[in-house]
Amino acid sequence: MYQPDFPPVPFRLGLYPVVDSVQWIERLLDAGVRTLQLRIKDRRDEEVEADVVAAIALGRRYNARLFINDYWRLAIKHQAYGVHLGQEDLQATDLSAIRAAGLRLGVSTHDDMEIDVALAARPSYIALGHVFPTQTKQMPSAAQGLEQLARHVERLADYPTVAIGGISLPRAPAVIATGVGSIAVVSAITQAADWRLATAQLLEIAGVGDE
């Protein structure tokens, strides 16, 4: 049963681009995307604060679900829609502070054991990855593939889920067919020859998410 310790999110978050700049946040919001994540890695809070503030303001303007990856203190300070954390960040994060601030929480997982850890935190949604090999970031685990993804989705049938990792436009329909509520994409949009067309096609497949 879906009873998160954090504010709930829609069961289907739809297309969920993960990008590293405010410019991409603005482009995608303008293109109709309504669930996004700002993921800027390996910089100090003070170096990214202006970008976090700008991204959150854009999310509000478009009434979108804007998640901040990792920088949970800044997300709380500036009242983001939500925070996304990797497994390695869970232990070092004050989850009670995120909860008290009324922010949603998403957690990454890569296998059944990590799903157990995520469920113990009772987040707003659980990300399942990486589905396919990905060049976007170094991954310590093997790609899960569609069969494993479908098994995890079935296990988490009552939970909002997000598939991530190597999801290209041609692969997206098969990923959605597993029943997962959302697909997170990176290079499928940011490295597309025509990002507007790629975004429109992915929105056709995954939707904008439930209200």
Swiss-Prot record:
Keyword Ubl conjugation: no
GO cellular component: cytoplasm
CDD domains: TMP_TenI (cd00564)
Highest rank taxon of the organism: Bacteria
Residues binding Mg(2+), per UniProt: 70, 89
InterPro entries linked: Aldolase_TIM, ThiamineP_synth_sf, ThiamineP_synth_TenI, TMP_synthase
Keyword tRNA-binding: no
BP GO terms, sorted: thiamine biosynthetic process; thiamine diphosphate biosynthetic process
HAMAP family on file: TMP_synthase (MF_00097)
Protein's recorded name: Thiamine-phosphate synthase
Annotated organism of origin: Shigella dysenteriae serotype 1 (strain Sd197)
Originating gene: thiE
